[in-house]
Amino acid sequence: MADEGKSYSEHDDERVNFPQRKKKGRGPFRWKYGEGNRRSGRGGSGIRSSRLEEDDGDVAMSDAQDGPRVRYNPYTTRPNRRGDAWHDRDRIHVTVRRDRAPPERGGAGTSQDGTSKNWFKITIPYGRKYDKAWLLSMIQSKCSVPFTPIEFHYENTRAQFFVEDASTASALKAVNYKILDRENRRISIIINPSAPPHTILNELKPEQVEQLKLIMSKRYDGSQQALDLKGLRSDPDLVSQNIDVVLNRRSCMAATLRVIEENIPELLSLNLSHNRLYRLDDMSSIVQKVPNLKILNLSGNELKSERELDKIKGLKLEELWLDGNSLCDTFRDQSTYIRSVVACVSAIRERFPKLLRLDGHELPPPIAFDVEAPTTLPPCKGSYFGTENLKSLVLHFLQQYYAIYDSGDRQGLLDAYHDGACCSLSIPFIPQNPARSSLAEYFKDSRNVKKLKDPTLRFRLLKHTRLNVVAFLNELPKTQHDVNSFVVDISAQTSTLPCFSVNGVFKEVDGKSRDSLRAFTRTFIAVPASNSGLCIVNDELFVRNASSEEIQRAFAMPAPTPSSSPVPTLSPEQQEMLQAFSTQSGMNLEWSQKCLQDNNWDYTRSAQAFTHLKAKGEIPEVAFMK
C-alpha cells in the first residue's frame, strides 16, 4: 500500500490507541488518534468470492503434482462422462468437483512472505452429518503428519477445508477409506488442487484492520452500547482509504467480530443492515464473543431462509430486524408475516424465545418458564406386578437369572431361554467418537434402530436361538447387579405370555471399565417352562451410563446373604418374634431380622419403621423374595 511513494511505516503521526485491558470485556470502547494525513491502501484485491462455488467436472488426486483425472460420478446428471465403474458399494463414495477456472498448475498461491504455495481442497462426501471436532480428530489420528485445516465449512452435504502444501495433501490422501463412522461405513476423503481459499485471498492486512478499528470507533455509541455498521462497505472513510470491507466475506466478518470481542464484548445493540449478507455461517461465533447482545438489525440484507437464524440462535435477543430480506417475501403481507412469527411455535420465536420486538412491532410476551429453580419431577413409582401370583413368579425368576448372570459363567442361562429365542442390545447414540466412549465395549453389538439404517446389519445384530443368545451374553463384560435398585413392571400379560421389564444399575467387575456403573433396562417376553418357571423368547437389553443420582444410590444397602433359616445364635424368643414379624410383614426372614435388629428387637418400633418405609416405597422387592 502506497501513498505518494511513502510506505505505511512512514505515517507515524497517525495512531490508534486502545485502553489497556487486563481482562477481555472490560473498559470503554475508545480509540484515540491524532491528526495527520490519511494513508491510502487497497484491501480485498484479487479474486472476489462468488456466493456459490461453481463446479464443473469431477477430479481425483493421484499425486500432488499430477493433473486432475476425470472420474465417473454416479450422482451427476451431466451427459457424456466417462470413467470407472461403480465399486465398493458398502463405502461412501462421492467425488469432488473442481472449480470452473482453476489456476495454472492447480492450487498455486503466494504467501505473505512472497513464496509460492500449493493449495488443496479436502472434501468429505456426506461430511455434514459428522461433528466437526470428531471428524477432524479422526482424520488427524490417521494422518501421518500434523495439519491445520483452513476454512473448514459445510457445503450442501459435504464437509470441506483447505491445506497449503502437497506433502500434507498426500498424507491426507492416504487416510481415504481408513476411518469408520458410527454406522460402520468407510469415510471417503477426496483431495483436489485448488485456488487459495477466499479467507487467504481477501484477508485484511494489519494496517487495514487498524483502519477498520478506527472507523468502528466512530460508529460506536458508548452511552447506548450500540455499534452501527450499516452499509459498512460504503463507509466514506473506508472508501477514501481504498479498503474493501465486505461483511459477507468470511475474513472480513471474522476481523469485525474480533475487533468487537477485543474492545466491546459488552455490546448490547448491533446494526448490520444493508451489508448484502446472504448467510450467517460466519457470524456463528458472535454467540460466544458478544453474549449480552439484545438488539440485532439484519434488515436490508439477502437472507433467503429463516433457517439462517439457526447459526445465531444462542443469542438472547429482545429485538430483531429482518425486513427487506428475501425470507420476508414468503409471506403475502405484513400482517401475515407478523402473525406467523409471533406464535410460540413460529420459526423465529423458537430460536429467540425472549424476543419482544420484531421489525419494530411489539410482540406478545413470550410464554416461557423463565424460572431459575429446577423443576422437580414426580417421584418414580415402585414396581407393578398385577397379581401376587405373577409377582412371586417373576421375582423368583429374576433372582435365579441374575444370580447366574453375575456368577462369571453365564452358560447356566441356557435353561432360561427358549430354543427359538432372540436377543438384542442397544446403547444410546454417542455424538463423540464411539471408540473412545466408556460404552465402547457395547458399541460393536449395539442395534439402535434409530441410528442404524442398514437392514442387513440390523438383522445380523439380532441374536437368534438360545445357543447364540447365551454365547453373546458370555461376551459382554462381567457384572454385579444391585438387586436393591430393581424396579419391575409387568406391561402385558396373557395366560401363556407375560411381558415384563426390569430397570436398575450394575457395575462391571473386570476389564478396562472395572467398577464403572451402568444403568440398564431389560424387557423380557416369556412363556411358561416345564419346571413351573419362565422361559424367555425375547430379550431386549438397553445399557447407558448411570446418572449422578443413580451412582449415589447404587449399592448403598448391601443385600443380605441368602439363608433358608434364621441365624442359630438367636434366642428362642427372638426366633419366635422373627417368624411372627416375617409372617405379618410379608418379608423374608433375612430382611425381617435386619429390621428387628435395626430397632433393637422392639417389635412395635420395628412394625412402625416397616410401615413407614413401605409407604415411601423404600423397601426393595428382594426383601419379599422367599
From Swiss-Prot:
The modification Omega-N-methylarginine is found at residue 42. It comes from the Eukaryota. Residues 572-626 form the TAP-C domain. Residues 2-118 are annotated as: RNA-binding (RBD). The modification Phosphoserine is found at residue 9. The modification Asymmetric dimethylarginine is found at residue 42. Residues 119-198 form the RRM domain. Residues 2-60 are annotated as: Minor non-specific RNA-binding. Its main location: nucleus. One of its GO terms (molecular function) is RNA binding. Residues 20-29 have a biased composition (Basic residues). Residues 1-85 are annotated as: Disordered. Residues 393-543 form the NTF2 domain. The modification N-acetylalanine is found at residue 2. LRR repeats lie at residues 266-291, 292-315, 316-350, 351-378. The modification 3'-nitrotyrosine is found at residue 126. Belongs to the NXF family. Heterodimer (via NTF2 domain) with NXT1. The formation of NXF1-NXT1 heterodimers is required for the NXF1-mediated nuclear mRNA export. Forms a complex with RANBP2/NUP358, NXT1 and RANGAP1. Associates with the exon junction complex (EJC) and with the transcription/export (TREX) complex. Found in a mRNA complex with UPF3A and UPF3B. Found in a post-splicing complex with RBM8A, UPF1, UPF2, UPF3A, UPF3B and RNPS1. Involved in the nuclear export of mRNA species bearing retroviral constitutive transport elements (CTE) and in the export of mRNA from the nucleus to the cytoplasm (TAP/NFX1 pathway). The NXF1-NXT1 heterodimer is involved in the export of HSP70 mRNA in conjunction with ALYREF/THOC4 and THOC5 components of the TREX complex. ALYREF/THOC4-bound mRNA is thought to be transferred to the NXF1-NXT1 heterodimer for export. The minimal CTE binding domain consists of an RNP-type RNA binding domain (RBD) and leucine-rich repeats. This is Nuclear RNA export factor 1. The lineage of its organism: Eukaryota, Metazoa, Chordata, Craniata, Vertebrata. The gene is NXF1.
